[in-house]
């Protein structure tokens, strides 16, 4: 036990970049806690801190898959990730140096967040994916590098791996929102990087390249994603190409029946189409048709004042 504590102390004393990251995460967390119960707080506020929502990431705010790692909202999430960063980050930084540690974190954050976004419609927030990458790296290195050998590696592996299905269970039945895909992809990346300079170097480099390639492509093309379809639907909607926009909104609803973006914007398109028909029929004196179209609009939007007022004007 004394040896373990001495090792932790040495890691912390020699760590530099780890403490910079921790201080930045703490600053963001404190600012969010200060603002979250005020009228100033919104999704836009989180974007300013570095965590744009999925829709915004697909709208060219690609930096969000990296900067979101520094953002924490809940106390439990922040405390766990802060402890993980201190212990795992300082351990790795001491052994590979600041430059390699920075590059490792950049790759881990990019891939873990991109995979989480691509397969869940939410990039998530926090350092969980990066911490799992650090653990995956350390655990794999224990078998090939004497500097990384730790006595409790098997116990730690069991705990870390069992935590993933536990979080998934709590996501479904306990109201949690843990980015489990980020944990899995982070652990995988860490394990791959550990073998980067081994006899499997070429295979590892190819694997990492493919993971990064998928991460990049997924930001501009994920047709199975409801949020991606919504982002494209709004893009074409704003360009007045309603047919193309409608196809994207329908796809969004296909992949997520509860998609507010898809359902609400389809209603807007339908109301616009009915409004144009009602306007034409009213001006031509075809009042029966006009009444029908006004009533159809009110079935979709019962508070539509334009349809209500024009109904009153009908003879």
Question: Across the structure, where does each feature detected by a protein language model lie?
Answer:
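TPR alpha-solenoid repeat register
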Residues: 261-262, 307
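Alpha-helical tetratricopeptide repeat
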Residues: 223-237, 268-282, 309
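A detector for small-residue-rich transmembrane helices and their helix-helix packing motifs
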Residues: 2-234
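Residue-level recognition of tetratricopeptide repeat
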Residues: 232, 258-259, 304
